[in-house]
Amino acid sequence: MDFYYLPGSAPCRAVQMTAAAVGVELNLKLTDLMKGEHMKPEFLKLNPQHCIPTLVDEDGFVLWESRAIQIYLVEKYCAHDPALAERLYPGDPRRRAVVHQRLFFDVAILYQRFAEYYYPQIFGKKVAGDPDRLRSMEQALEFLNTFLEGERFVAGGDDPTIADFSILACILDCNVRRCRVRSAAI
């Protein structure tokens, strides 16, 4: 399956971690946003929202939004291994709800605040980050630390879930950019 991605993208890395966990090989299609490759007509035909990551399955099914892709990969490619599916994306409604909550926390709070603080510096050539946005991002990291109190993984349990992959990818970006993550166990 084709996977349109950018190596430095946390959402793309989360999908790559999920694909590796379920044993799916991705045909990597580097998509250079700085060159506008995501705005070319052939890409827009696949994904009118012109975002990455974008997955094109063997049968032509197209999906974007990293967390949706993660869920799809587990549901489709773990059918042969229910135990693996259960570890990555639990079937129990309460455990799955916590995984969803952590995924939504990542997309709406953690990664969003990371992007609000760092993207102006990365893409806008702004040298210094906005102190208010830094405080907001640090607050999101404190929420994450609260989730991890007494836990090995962000959604609890004994095994990492797709929520861990998603949040880990964001935290790796934070670490590269020298954010302060004190007690995160992932």
From Swiss-Prot:
Q: Name one GO molecular function term.
A: glutathione transferase activity
What is the name of the protein in this document?
Glutathione S-transferase 1, isoform A
Gene Ontology biological process terms in this record: glutathione metabolic process
Classification of source organism: Eukaryota, Metazoa, Ecdysozoa, Arthropoda, Hexapoda
Q: Reaction(s) catalyzed by this protein?
A: RX + glutathione = an S-substituted glutathione + a halide anion + H(+)
Corresponding gene? GstD1
Instruction: Name the family.
Output: Belongs to the GST superfamily. Theta family.
Task: Using the record, list the residue span of the signal peptide; answer none if the entry has no such feature.
Answer: none
Write down the Pfam families for this protein, in alphabetical order: GST_N
InterPro entries in UniProt: Glutathione-S-Trfase_C-like (IPR010987), Glutathione-S-Trfase_C_sf (IPR036282), Glutathione_S-Trfase_N (IPR004045), Thioredoxin-like_sf (IPR036249)
